[in-house]
């Protein structure tokens, strides 16, 4: 698979402390109790599998068999961006994909953290020409030196753009990312019900002042529509 799971130790959900309770508070037992479960010691290490969520566009062969990956769409998360716990793993996998001739589309909706590629202007650092959200499309064909990287930036009051993704033999597919986002949000009723337009999205302080004003205006219109 193009994305290899990362193994990690699970974080504790509960912290156990020690209370100074006199031993006389507990009834005495003359014999040690028998354990209710007995396993190998290695079972004490809880190792989980973590995978990156992504969408793969694959070739379909002439006999209707699913072929190799042509394009890979990745929704960036805090863990695979700069300074994240999965940054090294993700950088390795993206390099592997690009060297393999796979078109890579990266959706970065995290305005409060720098872009994954240092050549892209950074919104949180106040770089000129930076946008709070970006979609980058890297086509490494015929090779990385001759391939192209295209970055589509958009603001807080602009619809997510429609982008043409190159496939094989000159074929392209136009993907309307705004429609995908809206339909996904609407289909996840738990999220739509939790949307509180009386509150500004967080972290609101990481937006530029002019963008905070635009967000407040959009929120006000949404509040008037839903109330």
Where are these regions (language model features)?
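Gly/Pro/Ser/Thr-rich low-complexity, intrinsically disordered segments predominantly at protein N-termini
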Residues: 1-227
């Amino acid at each position: 698979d193009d994305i290899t799971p990362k193994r990690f130790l699970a974080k504790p959900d509960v912290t156990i402390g020690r209370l100074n309770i006199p031993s006389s508070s507990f009834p005495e037992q003359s014999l040690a109790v028998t354990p209710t479960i007995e396993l190998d010691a290695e079972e004490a290490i809880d190792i989980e599998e973590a995978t990156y969520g992504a969408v793969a566009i694959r070739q379909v062969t002439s006999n209707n068999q699913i072929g190799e990956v042509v394009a890979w769409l990745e929704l960036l998360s805090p863990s695979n961006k700069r300074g994240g716990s999965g940054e090294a793993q993700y950088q390795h996998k993206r390099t592997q994909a690009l060297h393999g001739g796979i078109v890579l589309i990266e959706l970065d909706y995290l305005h409060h953290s720098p872009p994954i590629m240092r050549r892209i202007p950074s919104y949180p650092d106040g770089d000129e020409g930076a946008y709070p959200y970006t979609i980058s499309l890297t086509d490494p064909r015929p090779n990385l030196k001759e391939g192209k990287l295209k970055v589509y930036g958009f603001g807080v009051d602009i619809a997510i753009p429609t982008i043409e993704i190159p496939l094989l033999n000159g074929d392209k597919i136009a993907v309307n990312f705004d429609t995908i986002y809206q339909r996904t949000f609407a289909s996840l009723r738990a999220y739509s019900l939790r949307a509180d337009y009386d509150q500004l999205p967080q972290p609101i302080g990481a937006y530029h002042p002019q963008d905070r004003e635009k967000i407040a205006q959009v929120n006000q219109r949404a509040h008037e529509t839903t109330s």
